[in-house]
Amino acid sequence: IITNKGFWLIELLCVLFYSAVFPFIKYAADLMVQKYNVDPKLAGTIPGLLPIGAIILTPLFGSLYDRIGKGATLMIIGSVMLIFVHTMFALPILNIWWFATIIMIILGFAFSLVPSAMWPSVPKIIPENKLGTAYALIFWIQNWGLMGVPYLIGKVLNNYCVIGGDEAMAEEITG
């Protein structure tokens, strides 16, 4: 397993992908309020589209993978979608709820596409008698990422983000 480059690429994708999705979902409701001016009572609705989309789309993408193969291509497409989503959420464009909804739906596609191709790809590159170790190693490293990324997000938010809009910023500057 240790010398299998394909395994390490899947491992890297797994830790980066899930570390870019799960912590984001934790902070997404606050993002909807702060950036998109969504009512706090409804702010969880937009990120809530993600699991609903995954329920519908993951079996469909799994079936697609079974029919056409092309696991690497499907994982790349899903990863590019994820990068696009995070870029759109990071840029100061279209700060309106419907834009956030569309971007969250695209994230739902990525969140379904990558795992439906990634997990069945592992047995294609790892011998059957090593699959338990391979999956355990994948989850072990993934959990390191899921532990570390929220910590890093918290550090960034605490050190570099101003919350409260123009009035709060002006008050901080002028005292």
Spans of features found by a protein language model:
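A late C-terminal transmembrane helix in Major Facilitator Superfamily
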Residues: 128-162
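Helix-to-coil boundary motifs at intracellular loop junctions of multi-pass secondary transporters
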Residues: 31-36, 67, 121-126, 159
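Extracytoplasmic gate region of multi-pass secondary transporters
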Residues: 4-55, 115, 119, 149-153
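C-terminal transmembrane helical hairpin of 12-TM major facilitator-type secondary transporters
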Residues: 71-121
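Helix-to-loop junctions at the C-terminal end of transmembrane segments
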Residues: 57-70, 157
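A membrane-interface helix-boundary motif in multi-pass transporters
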Residues: 155-175
